[in-house]
């Protein structure tokens, strides 16, 4: 155990250049390459990316107000708590985010409310 502690202490005192040189020497001595662990890490990263694709937060985007713009403005005001002018500007400036970073269930509920008012909505 004392030998391992000494090795750890010696390795901790190396400069970056010395550590890189040590790495090359060990690769030659043991006949291995540092590139192999990188490839394994990259493959593992692909699996993690698949898990990340299942989103937990969604943005509700108003793409078009449709023919019933007044009803859509009323619904946007109810959802966001914005004033009349701000809600009108948001609706007329479509496509714009009505609400961001909401749960999947809330995003679906907001989409239904806005579509019932006559708007076209995307959830991203």
UniProtKB/Swiss-Prot annotation:
Gene Ontology terms: biological process: translation
The UniProt record lists the keyword Ribonucleoprotein: yes
Domain of life: Bacteria
Entry keyword set: Ribonucleoprotein, Ribosomal protein
Gene3D superfamilies: 3.30.1390.10, Single helix bin
Coiled coil spans: none
Keyword Cytoplasm applies: no
Molecular function terms, GO-annotated: mRNA binding; structural constituent of ribosome
Family affiliation: Belongs to the bacterial ribosomal protein bL12 family.
Function: Forms part of the ribosomal stalk which helps the ribosome interact with GTP-bound translation factors. Is thus essential for accurate translation.
SUBUNIT field: Homodimer. Part of the ribosomal stalk of the 50S ribosomal subunit. Forms a multimeric L10(L12)X complex, where L10 forms an elongated spine to which 2 to 4 L12 dimers bind in a sequential fashion. Binds GTP-bound translation factors.
Protein name (database record): Large ribosomal subunit protein bL12
Organism: Allorhizobium ampelinum (strain ATCC BAA-846 / DSM 112012 / S4) (Agrobacterium vitis (strain S4))
Native organism taxonomy: Bacteria, Pseudomonadati, Pseudomonadota, Alphaproteobacteria, Hyphomicrobiales
């Amino acid at each position: 155990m004392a030998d391992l502690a000494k090795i750890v202490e010696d390795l901790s005192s190396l400069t970056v250049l010395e550590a890189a040189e040590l790495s090359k020497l060990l690769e030659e001595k043991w006949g291995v390459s540092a590139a192999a662990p990188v490839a394994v890490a990259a493959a593992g990263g692909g699996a993690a990316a698949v898990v990340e694709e299942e989103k937990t937060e969604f943005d509700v985007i108003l793409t078009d107000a449709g023919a019933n713009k007044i009803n859509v403005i009323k619904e946007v005001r109810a959802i966001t708590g914005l004033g009349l002018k701000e809600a009108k500007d948001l609706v007329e400036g479509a496509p714009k985010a009505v609400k961001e970073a909401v749960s999947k269930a809330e995003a679906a509920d907001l989409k239904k409310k806005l579509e019932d008012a006559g708007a076209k909505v995307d959830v991203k």
